[in-house]
């Protein structure tokens, strides 16, 4: 197994991720990071949940950004607010030693005015849910004409949840020569056909078995009345 240095990861990012406990690259990171750092082609990457996909695309995206330029250079789309915030937090942690680099999360259910102010101050990377990003594009606040990399995280979920129309509108606002990176745990053949409509010359990277669920994730559900959902959740968390 190679080290992060051997994969081409910069000293600033290595310092940050080592402080986070990263010791050796995970398989998806070892497969994806050098490819994205050394190649301009699009990617479909499939790997189980919890295998380090965020770092696999996040590290190369961060390393390719020019922090001296304030306009957005990378866009990461996610299906949910929770994932959006998680990705933004991770990228901020990975880039803590890159001076002048800013990551902004934009998502529904929060103040659009605050998010607008953050974007106006300058952000090289936007992490967004599709609906809120389109709102900000219509306001002229989210300008994507300098975006070089677009990432769809949990691509199958976004396409399954009916975000295709929104994603199409967003792609119309980014340069046609951008790189498109699709990351997901699973992807059906039907969804893959749709996904490929966003890609140019692409490489498919599969870590583990295709469309295999995460080995270490257990699923359980509880049946409760709607009025009792909050109390049930609180009891489970406690």
Q: What is each model feature region?
A:
Residues 1-46:
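Conserved pre-motif I regulatory segment
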Residues 11-19, 69-138, 146-149, 192-196, ...:
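Conserved nucleic-acid-binding Ia/Ib motif block in the N-terminal RecA-like helicase ATPase lobe
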Residues 23, 62, 66, 84, ...:
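Nucleotide phosphate-binding site architecture
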Residues 33-41, 54-69, 85, 89-95, ...:
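Walker A/P-loop NTP-binding motif
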